[in-house]
Structure formats: structure tokens, C-alpha cells
Amino acid sequence: AYESWERRQDQALRHATVLNDAKKDNNHIGAIQWCMTDYATHRDFGSGDRICYHGVMDSFRNPKDAAYFWGSQQEKDQVIHVSSSMDIGDYNGGIRGKVWIFTNADSVDVYKNNKKITTLSSSPYSALSHGPIPFSDTIGNLLETEEGFPKKKADIIKESLNAAVEYGFQNLPKKYLLKLAYIMIRYKMSFKDGVRLFEKYVSGWGGKGEEWKFQGIWNNKEGKSVTLSHSSKLHLEIQRDTTTLFEGNGYDETLIRIKVLDENNNLAPYAQLPVSIKTSGSIENAGFDLLTL
């Protein structure tokens, strides 16, 4: 998909909002989304490339965040998808803010560098069986386990650091400024100490690349998971719907997907490499002969 991650995430949340509202007012028998895929359009509509990016999948039938949201509303197959790469360079000021998890898991255990920091399950989309789950607390229990802080001290510091993520240090509401003052007096901490904790547990600046694991839990058992880290090894993956085509009164087709994935089998979104496709024998390419991933 060509849209930014912000737009793909926002699109998925708008789908969730509409379906949630339709279910909770008891006046709708169903809801139909627009639409399945991005599509070509005329010059007076769509984006500058004359493509309408309304689809929950792109023009090549590759799923966006919204497709994973809809997929999470069923019970047959396990679904877990994180709306972020967790790379701080994708965010203004390196602050991730709120990340969303689209899943039909009962809960999600979150690990940072192989250490469990929290378990998530609640969603603001209360009318949905499996509403999107927000995640913004990248600190979890680490102030207790890593810094050795008592729980009361850890909780108030964590609350203040997370508030700095939401509002920025320059725009902190008065109540958080008062809490920071209390922390500095009560625990004899300096502003420099706060900056160190913020950089270590929130922004990640100057530290070793982080690895995040989102482990889905179904019926008290681990199922599918998503692991996100700084990629260093890419590989090519080719998938096809079928290996056999049948000749009949018409013609048969199969869909072939070409992906560049990282070592955790996540898409490499910046690997926009050219691909040339050639066929031989009694088959023909029905798509583009030259395209970018």
C-alpha cells in the first residue's frame, strides 16, 4: 500500500468506529464497508495518481490494517496484527504514541527485549466482540523489575512519563507538573534522572535496538504472535494460490504474491524494489510486466 502508516491505521479505526456504533444502537441489522480494494478512477476523483485508496486491501489484494480489523471479527482463524513497526524513526520526535492491535485473541502479552511488561485485553470499542486494543505504555513493570523502584514510586513516575508522551514536556497539564515536583522532592530525583528514564524506557534514543513481541492468548494458551525489531536480514517470499491451472471453455488464473520480508516475516515497507516478470510456455502474465514492491 502506498499510504502512510498513519492513514492506514486511521482507516482501520474508522471502520471499527462505524461497526461499533452500528452494533450498539440496536437499530441496524448489518453494516457493509466500502470497499474491498483500491481502484483506478477518473481525473476528477481520487488521488493524484487517479487511484482511490478506499480499499481495505490495495490494488494487488494485499491487506491493510482495516482488512486485519475485519478479519479479527470472526472466531475460526487466529488473527493478530500490530498497526506499527515500532521503529521510532517513523514517528515525529521518536514518540510512538498510541499503537493499535487488531486481534481476536482473548488477551495479548507484550514483551520488550524478551521481558514481559504487560498484558492487554480491554478495548474502547465495547460493542465489538473483538475491538481494537490500544497500546501506549511501553514502560509496563520495568521500573520495578529493572530499576528496583517500589510499586508506588514506579506507578507515579510511569504515569508522568506516559503523560509526557501524550502531551509533550512543554505542554504537560498542571497536575502532572505537580506530580513531577512531588517526585523530585519525595524521591530526590533530578530532571536529568527523569530524562534518563524517558530515553531508556520510552523513546529508546541512544540505546540498543528494541525487540517487541505481541503474543496472542486464546483459551489460556499461546497462539499466533507478532515480533517487531530492527531488521537486518531480508528475504524474498513468493506465494501462489494454486500450482495447477485447468484449461476449459475459458481460461484459469492464479494469484502470485511477491514479498520482501524481514527475519520476523514482517513486510519490509521501505524495500520498494523493481520486479520484472517474464513468462514462457503456454501461460501469460495478466498483470504488469514491471512493477515495484
Regions found by a protein language model. Give the residues of each.
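Short, solvent-exposed loop/linker segments at the N-terminal edge
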Residues: I88-G94, T243-T254
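Low-complexity "stalk/linker" and mucin-like segments enriched in Ser/Thr/Pro/Ala/Gly
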Residues: Y125-I139, Q239, G281-L293
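Edge beta-strands of extracellular beta-sandwich domains
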Residues: T119, N220-E237
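Beta-strand-rich structural segments
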Residues: V99-T103, D252-P269
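Extracellular Ig-like/FN3 beta-sandwich strand-entry sites
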Residues: G207-E211, Y251-E253, Q272
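Short, aromatic- and glycine-rich surface loops/edge beta-strands on solvent-exposed regions
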Residues: E144-E159, S203-K221, L293
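Short, well-ordered beta-strand segments
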Residues: H54, K115-T119, A271-E284, F288-L290
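Extended substrate-binding grooves/exosites of carbohydrate-active enzymes
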Residues: A1-V195
